Design a protein with these regions (language model features):
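A structural signal for multi-pass alpha-helical bundles of membrane permease subunits
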Residues: 3-293
Length: 293
């Protein structure tokens, strides 16, 4: 009895710091954001009148907010699809294929993930620089000067330029996650499939993909959360939301710290509900029976 009590005390003691930190830095701020969104406060310090849902009514009629939501939906969709495909492709090649320099490529692919978003923004500012940037210079060298653009200054393509940077930053992280799952798949499954005449492509779709599916489902949630956060930082550093690049967190930031604190919190509530709902939808539509080996 005393042993069980000691074990229970030890478990609670280990969990307590994490629970306390989660309450202080996640639960309390989230509740505060919801509460403040119903008031008319200009800043964090001064009180404001209770306005119920007025902030939300104004928010949903603001074309800038609607455009920012369209931008983040486009960004999440493209970043998720392209990163998912490339990360799985590279993970498969580095796990299932034998060639020289595998460890080198693992390191190269992962390097962008250890760089801060500020460094990545600086790298792509140099790449996209219109007059003597790396990309335009390369296009001129290979005789495609007609394709040169102001990559971060043209409203028609600037969002796609940002998306490319976010994809480059994310591939290595998800590749490593998928490699970890693929490495745990028993080799005898592939050997049996080969004896049955299954080629590598069929083996991928019949063995690899089903057995790493739960990992893919988990990473889809990461895609949503990380893209919302990283797109804000990248946009804030490079364009500050101009040229139609504003995403919801930029919109929230600009409003909350420009004398519309409660209105910015209302935008924050919408962003939270959007990310929560999208994560739930992705979790449900990708749900399938767990395959074990």
């Amino acid at each position: 009895m005393n042993k069980k009590k000691a074990q229970r005390t030890f478990i609670f003691g280990c969990l307590a710091p994490a629970v306390i930190l989660a309450i202080l830095f996640i639960a309390v701020p989230t509740i505060t954001v919801f509460k403040e969104s119903f008031f008319d406060k200009t800043d964090l310090i001064h009180d404001g009148a209770f306005v119920a849902l007025d902030n939300f009514k104004v928010l949903f009629s603001d074309e800038r907010f609607i455009e920012s939501m369209q931008n983040i939906i486009l960004t999440i969709t493209l970043v998720t699809l392209v990163t998912l495909i490339l990360a799985i492709l590279f993970a498969t090649l580095l796990t299932r294929e034998e060639f020289r320099g595998k460890n080198f490529f693992r390191v190269i692919f992962y390097i962008p993930n250890i760089l801060s978003i500020v460094v990545i923004a600086g790298i792509f500012a140099a790449i996209y620089q219109p007059s003597n940037g790396i990309l335009n210079s390369f296009l001129e060298v290979i005789g495609l000067s007609g394709l040169t653009r102001a990559w971060m200054g043209d409203p028609d393509i600037v969002n796609y330029s940002i998306i490319v940077a976010l994809i480059w930053q994310a591939i290595g992280y998800y590749m490593v996650m998928y490699m970890a799952s693929m490495s745990s798949i028993p080799e005898n499954l592939y050997e049996a499939a080969s004896l049955e005449g299954a080629g590598k492509i069929k083996q991928f779709f019949m063995i690899t993909l089903p057995l790493i599916w739960n990992n893919i489902r988990t990473t889809l949630i990461f895609f949503v959360i990380s893209t919302i956060n990283l797109s804000f930082m990248f946009v804030q550093i490079n364009t500050e939301g101009s040229l139609g690049t504003e995403v919801p967190l930029n919109y929230m930031y600009n409003k909350a710290f420009a004398g519309n604190y409660s209105y910015g919190m209302a935008a924050g509530v919408c962003i939270f509900l959007f990310s929560f709902a999208l994560s739930g939808i992705l979790n449900n539509i990708t749900k399938r029976d767990v395959l074990e080996f």
